[in-house]
Amino acid sequence: MSSDYNMVSVCMITYNHEAYIAQAIEGVLMQKTNFRFELVIGEDCSTDSTRRICERYADRYPDIINLLPSEKNLGMMPNANRTTDACKGKYIALCEGDDYWTDPLKLQKQVDFLERNKKFSGVFHNVLIINENLPDKIDSTTVRAGIYNQKEIYLNNVVPTLSLVFCNKVSI
């Protein structure tokens, strides 16, 4: 494995997230791992200061952050597709621009699990949901520990996006 190999690509899509994007990026940068990772940010032509914030981080962390600015608004799915396509790591982790990670060992724990358990193509966990318009935090305890197949994941929407780490380029 070369020294410039990224084990994980963190895929972050963002549009008009100026109030949240710095915290989302900081949650990725605080990760403590024994492997290299990259942060690929798909900035979708925001009309607020989201792009400027992303550019400042990309300038400060050029070895970690790959900023993909768009010259016109693509929409969520096209932006997600182009950002995911730019991810070159063995694994992809998702964290959108209005989400953030609180556990500095999140990536290490999930990659350790996937490396020890080759029959799994992804791993996810419960999350704490904070909505600034609601007084209480919500724990996503609807996610039951267990093994899920593709059909269960797609039909039951059991995966909190920001908790997911999965194998890149898995054939389905």
Regions found by a protein language model. Give the residues of each.
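Nucleotide-sugar donor-binding/catalytic module of glycosyltransferases
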Residues: 1-172
